[in-house]
From Swiss-Prot:
Pathway: Carbohydrate metabolism; D-tagatose 6-phosphate degradation; D-glyceraldehyde 3-phosphate and glycerone phosphate from D-tagatose 6-phosphate: step 2/2. The gene is gatZ. This is D-tagatose-1,6-bisphosphate aldolase subunit GatZ. Component of the tagatose-1,6-bisphosphate aldolase GatYZ that is required for full activity and stability of the Y subunit. Could have a chaperone-like function for the proper and stable folding of GatY. When expressed alone, GatZ does not show any aldolase activity. Is involved in the catabolism of galactitol. Belongs to the GatZ/KbaZ family. GatZ subfamily. It comes from Escherichia coli O9:H4 (strain HS).
């Protein structure tokens, strides 16, 4: 990361896409996409997804590392080309507890990430805990971030410190996506970004972390990009120019969250304006969902009724029976809920892919389709971009490859924006 940031600060148009997903097919796609390049791939886990208690994936940081490395070995991607990151590391999961208890868990969280070899650490203590004022004072946020940084430094080996990098600050939306419809978005003011940097510098120095400050590579801000279930707020470069100009006088770049669904031109403009770390998550699993839905429609027409997976019906049944991952985010009317379950841009289906019933139905569908020749006309109907690549000889009409290429479509846009 440090080399990439140095190149950007030296005037090169270079950025990096941060893949924020624990889905094995998404991780496989991210690694396979860059297998034949010289680029490194940044894969990040969030604190609610992966933590010392397992998170919602059931994985600790060490488990996640091995999970990613196993996929890398299968793909033929060198492990040393993978950068592992931890996103929103702090009290996010334990906000209902008092600050002392939440921070104690957060300290252990950060230590486990660093011990497991994660080298990009987002120190985010911006969340109010039980009994805290809302919002927290910037000084409190910075002091807690310094506590977390101290924890990271305390377990890092000398070798790790050479690679270790920190990200500070936070964007406006909560981790995991917007819970309601958005009309506009608040772009971070330069004064607020400067205050974030100033308060963190002061807090780090007070804890004897002056050297660690040199490892702070980025600050998270809101550049004016966001999405909800059916709306996308697109990047307006002119609105972010004050931020772009301010960061030029520092050693850092910006990290932009929720950059999903922007245009490839927007990604290029974001990187030009020093938002050099572009995080993406739901757009990748949304592309995965689109591919699975398309293949499910193809299966409906090609496979005898008694052998079909019933994949789409199974997904719907499970999500309606177990609504905990979408209920507070989606609309309440039955028809509206179904539309959101299937097609929301926030893609909360992503939490359900590991469910045994859904996984088994998708596996059945894949086996069914691997045993037949999919007519080109059907691929043109349901996966038109993939049809074009089959025609040009870039792609085969194999279900797994079709899913991979659908995810590649998202990664292609980021590659354009981050181009070296």
């Amino acid at each position: 990361m440090k080399t990439l940031i140095a190149r950007h600060k030296a005037g090169e148009h270079i950025g990096i896409c941060s893949v924020c997903s624990a889905h094995p097919l998404v991780i496989e796609a991210a690694l396979a996409f860059d297998r034949n390049s010289t680029r490194k791939v940044l894969i990040e886990a969030t604190s609610n997804q992966v933590n010392q208690f397992g998170g919602y994936t059931g994985m600790t940081p060490a488990d996640f590392r091995e999970f990613v490395f196993t996929i890398a070995d299968k793909v033929g991607f060198a492990r040393e080309r993978i950068i592992l990151g931890g996103d929103h590391l702090g009290p996010n999961c334990w906000q209902q507890e008092n600050a002392d208890a939440a921070m104690e868990k957060s300290v252990e969280l950060v230590k486990e990430y660093v011990r497991a070899g994660f080298s990009k650490i987002h120190l985010d203590a911006s969340m109010s805990c039980a009994g805290d004022p809302i919002p927290l004072a910037p000084e409190t946020v910075a002091e807690r971030a310094a506590v977390l940084c101290f924890a990271a430094e305390s377990v890092a080996t000398d070798c790790q410190r050479e690679q270790l990098s920190y990200v500070i600050g936070t964007e406006v939306p909560v981790p995991g996506g917007e819970a309601s419809a958005i009309q506009s978005v608040h772009i971070t003011h330069v004064e607020d970004a400067a205050n974030t940097l100033r308060t963190h510098q002061k807090a780090f120095i007070a804890r004897g972390l002056t050297e660690a400050l040199t490892r702070v590579i980025a600050i998270v801000v809101q550049p004016g990009v966001e999405f909800d279930h059916s709306n996308i707020i697109h990047y307006q470069p002119q609105e972010a120019q004050p931020l772009a100009q301010w960061i030029e006088n520092t050693r850092m770049v910006y990290e932009a969250h929720s950059t999903d669904y922007q245009t490839r031109t927007a990604y290029w403009e974001l990187v030009r304006d020093h938002f050099a770390i572009l995080k993406v998550g739901p757009a990748l699993t949304f592309a995965l969902r689109e591919a699975i839905f398309a293949l499910a429609q193809i299966e409906q027409e090609l496979i005898a009724p008694e052998n079909r997976s019933g994949c789409l019906a199974v997904i719907e049944e499970v999500m309606l029976d177990e609504p905990q991952y979408w209920k507070k985010y989606y609309r309440t009317g039955f028809n509206d809920s179904l539309l959101d379950i299937r097609y929301s841009l926030s893609d909360r289906i992503r939490y359900y892919w590991p469910h045994s019933r859904i996984k088994n139905s998708v596996d059945t569908m894949m086996v069914n389709l691997e045993g037949v020749d999919i007519p080109l006309g059907m691929i043109s109907q349901y996966l038109p971009k993939q049809f074009e690549r089959i025609q040009s000889g870039e792609l085969s009409a194999i279900p797994h490859q079709l899913i991979m290429d659908k995810i590649y479509d998202v990664l292609r846009a980021y590659r354009y924006g981050c181009a070296e």
